[in-house]
């Protein structure tokens, strides 16, 4: 805005007061008047240089939010007169109170030249250009623009507060911010996250100042958007923080289905449970099940249970769930383990020599199968694929081929397919055949090749025959599925027939085939030999069976003899002492047997026969380690000790029983009676002068009469107290250790830990004997045995 000086305005005002020069008057007539006016103006301007009126502060552009207070300043210097404000050129009035404008008033000190315009509760109508004028001084201020900002009156999302949408169908969310000045800006949020891509437009209202903003956000709802909150925020300079409004989505969608199988891997024939888990909005109305595209009747629940077969591996099971919106179908295959099943069968093939042949065989199995092609009667694998390719085939390639499928740990299956190769006849009979002299014989000629032979002829010696009978010879032809058989039958086979070669020749369209067959004699065993061998084998079987029965019987009988006598209340204490020398006078053996001995014999008599029987069946080998073991072999049941004084009571002495024959090392096998029967075993040995130990041991002779049988002998009495010995040289009789000879012969020399020969080899056995663990070579033998029955 250009400021005008007071002199300039005055001149303008004065010039406007001058009358307009008539057009018809000449310029000379007005010249004096112009000069006078000019002189007056100059006089006035020069007369008032210090009292010039001017604006010290003029109104400026302002921006105010609707409802707020606005003040437009206006300050004049050297002026006392009327001041008024104009709004868009319209005078608001004079004075401080503007009655026509209740929200407007002039404020400030007039003495200070302040004529400020105050506007309270600014409205859109206050949005205008304002000017301050000093009327008497003919002064006008520059124009000030007052801009009133209007926030959006309303922010709204179409369709709220809940918008029902269809899953998968695109939809535009529309937000509107009404009557804002300036136009509002709209921002979208999805669950608090700002969204991009909205399209915004504005509409100008009729007042030309306010605008409505429209924003559209394109979404494609899914079932996951159910309950999702979208927020629209509108803002402008009047409301920097903006206004918000929100809506919630309700998405209708077809069922969302998950189909599961339990168990996931099964064998053919096992039971499987299908479970169809579904969520939908609105609610689910029902279920439908199908297999391989065919509806399964009576299956209308979320679970379907059935026994599976191999078809479930290739034909899917589907579950369809539906509601008002639509339906969802989910399918699955079952991992069924099953044996191979053929899909494409191999076909018999006939071809010519030199052609290429392809044999096809297709299997299915689970787990993945292994496929092999082999030729019959051969283990060579020709192919591992569904097809077997044979190039330039010959008649040797003809035959039966096997297509075998293997499913590990499940099963094996195979199919056979014949391959026929056209060619001359091939005779596959044995070159040497057999017959029995004097009986009827047959010579066979078999042709299995293709095509079948048209003619088959036999030739031998000077004879030729295709079919029929010639003397003793007859030819017959038989057709079968595998080929043609021509049989030459010979009646009453003779020696000359074994010296003849038989020629079998066959013809077909590809040529002839020939085979030479030799007939040999078959040896026939006489009927007597066959019958004898049969009878002998039968007898052998019978005897073997009888021996087995006898063996089992004896084992069972032996186990029954191991019994324990528990009810007899008999206690026998036996003390044996043997001095270094023996008495010379001994009483009769039968007289020396005490009453206790007879009692013991009576007790053991029931076992005597069985002991004698088993005596020859046992042979105990002395273990030299027992010599140094201190453990009681009876586990405490028998108290056998050496170097102990005899008790004063219940002592029974027994005479020594001695065989009259040559003395020898007597290591007889122990009794059959085991420890479980409750009876001890005490090994005893014959005694003789030291000189007798050098003789070669001989088998025992018969026992001396008068009670010399030592089988019931328990101990020997020490006759040292009688100072007499029954044998010459008894004073030098060496001590011995029970169970071991003191001075073994040269053939029996052993180290302390070296095993002796079997005891039964040199001596007989004495029942109820044990070796004393404490007897030594240099001390007197002393044995004490307590028996509790």
From Swiss-Prot:
Residues 694-712 have a biased composition (Low complexity). One of its GO terms (cellular component) is membrane raft. Its main location: membrane. It is found in: Cell membrane. Residues 49-147, 152-248, 255-331, 340-419, 424-520 form the Ig-like C2-type domain. Residues 48-531 are extracellular. The modification Phosphoserine is found at residue 606. One of its GO terms (biological process) is cell-cell adhesion. Residues 1-47 form the signal peptide. This is Kin of IRRE-like protein 1. It comes from Mus musculus. Required for proper function of the glomerular filtration barrier. It is involved in the maintenance of a stable podocyte architecture with interdigitating foot processes connected by specialized cell-cell junctions, known as the slit diaphragm. Is a signaling protein that needs the presence of TEC kinases to fully trans-activate the transcription factor AP-1. Knockout of this gene results in perinatal lethality accompanied by proteinuria, and effacement of glomerular podocytes. The chain crosses the membrane at residues 532-552.
């Amino acid at each position: 805005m250009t400021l005008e000086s007071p002199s300039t305005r005055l001149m303008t005002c004065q010039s406007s007061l001058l009358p307009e020069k008539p057009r018809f008057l000449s310029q000379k007539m007005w010249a004096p008047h112009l000069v006078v006016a000019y002189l007056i103006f100059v006089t006035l301007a020069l007369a008032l240089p210090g009292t010039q009126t001017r604006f010290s502060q003029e109104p400026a552009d302002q921006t105010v939010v609707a409802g707020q207070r606005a003040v437009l300043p206006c300050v004049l210097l050297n002026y006392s007169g009327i001041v008024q404000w104009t709004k868009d050129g319209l005078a608001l009035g004079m004075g401080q109170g503007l009655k026509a404008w209740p929200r407007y008033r002039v404020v400030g000190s007039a003495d200070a030249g302040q004529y400020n315009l105050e506007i309270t509760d600014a409205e859109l109508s206050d949005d205008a250009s304002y000017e301050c004028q000093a009327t008497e001084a003919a002064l006008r201020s520059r124009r000030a623009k007052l801009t009133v900002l209007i926030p959006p009156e309303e922010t709204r999302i179409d369709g709220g507060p809940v918008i029902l949408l269809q899953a998968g169908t695109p939809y535009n969310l529309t937000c509107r911010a009404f009557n804002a000045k300036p136009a509002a800006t709209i921002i979208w949020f999805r669950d608090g996250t700002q969204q991009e891509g909205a399209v915004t437009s504005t509409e100008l209202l009729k007042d030309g100042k306010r605008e409505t903003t429209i924003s559209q956000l394109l979404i494609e709802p899914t079932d996951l958007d159910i309950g999702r909150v979208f927020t629209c925020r509108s803002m402008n300079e009047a409301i920097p923080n903006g206004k918000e409004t929100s809506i919630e989505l309700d998405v209708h969608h077809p069922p969302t289905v998950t189909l599961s199988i339990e168990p996931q891997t099964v064998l053919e024939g096992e039971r499987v449970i299908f479970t169809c888990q579904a969520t939908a909005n609105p609610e689910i109305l029902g279920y439908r099940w199908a297999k391989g595209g065919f509806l399964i009747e009576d299956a209308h629940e979320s679970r379907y249970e059935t026994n599976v077969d191999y078809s479930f591996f290739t034909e899917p099971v589907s579950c369809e769930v539906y509601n008002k919106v639509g339906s969802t179908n989910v399918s699955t295959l079952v991992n069924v383990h099953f044996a191979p099943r053929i899909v494409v069968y191999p076909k018999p093939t006939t071809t010519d020599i030199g052609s290429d042949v392809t044999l096809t065989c297709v299997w299915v199995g689970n787990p993945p199968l292994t496929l092999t092609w082999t030729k019959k009667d051969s283990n060579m694998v020709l192919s591992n694929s569904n097809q077997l390719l044979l190039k330039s085939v010959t008649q040797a390639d003809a035959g039966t081929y096997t297509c075998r499928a293997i499913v590990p740990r499940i099963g094996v299956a195979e199919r056979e397919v014949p391959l026929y190769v056209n060619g001359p006849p091939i005779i596959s009979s044995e070159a040497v055949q057999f017959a029995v002299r004097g009986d009827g014989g047959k010579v066979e000629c078999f042709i299995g090749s293709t095509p079948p032979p048209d003619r088959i002829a036999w030739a031998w010696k000077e004879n030729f025959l295709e079919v029929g009978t010639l003397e003793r010879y007859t030819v017959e032809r038989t057709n079968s599925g595998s080929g043609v058989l021509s049989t030459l039958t010979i009646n009453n086979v003779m020696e000359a027939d074994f010296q003849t070669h038989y020629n079998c020749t066959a013809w077909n369209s590809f040529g002839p085939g020939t085979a030479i067959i030799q007939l040999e004699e078959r040896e026939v065993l006489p009927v007597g030999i066959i019958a004898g061998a049969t009878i002998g084998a039968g007898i052998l079987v019978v005897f073997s069976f009888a021996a087995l029965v006898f063996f089992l019987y004896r084992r069972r009988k032996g186990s029954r003899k191991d019994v324990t006598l528990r009810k007899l209340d008999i206690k026998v204490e036996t003390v044996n002492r043997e001095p270094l020398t023996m008495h010379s006078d001994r009483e009769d053996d039968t007289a020396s047997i005490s009453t206790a001995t007879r009692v013991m014999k009576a007790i053991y008599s029931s076992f005597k026969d069985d002991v004698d029987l088993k005596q020859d069946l046992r042979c105990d080998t002395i273990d030299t380690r027992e010599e140094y073991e201190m453990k009681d072999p009876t586990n405490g049941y028998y108290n056998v000790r050496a170097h102990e004084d005899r008790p004063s009571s219940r002592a029974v002495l027994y005479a020594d029983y001695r065989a009259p024959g040559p003395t020898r090392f007597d290591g007889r096998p122990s009794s059959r009676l085991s420890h479980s029967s409750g009876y001890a075993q005490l090994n005893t040995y014959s005694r003789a002068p030291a000189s007798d130990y050098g003789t070669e041991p001989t088998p025992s002779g018969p026992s001396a009469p008068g009670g010399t049988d030592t089988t019931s002998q328990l101990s020997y009495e020490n006759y040292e107290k009688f100072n007499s010995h029954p044998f010459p040289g008894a004073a030098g009789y060496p001590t011995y250790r029970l169970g071991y000879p003191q001075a073994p012969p040269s053939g029996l020399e052993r180290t302390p830990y070296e095993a002796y020969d079997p005891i039964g080899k040199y001596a007989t056995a004495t029942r109820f004997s044990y070796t004393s663990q404490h007897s030594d070579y240099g001390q007197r033998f002393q044995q004490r045995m307590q028996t509790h029955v």
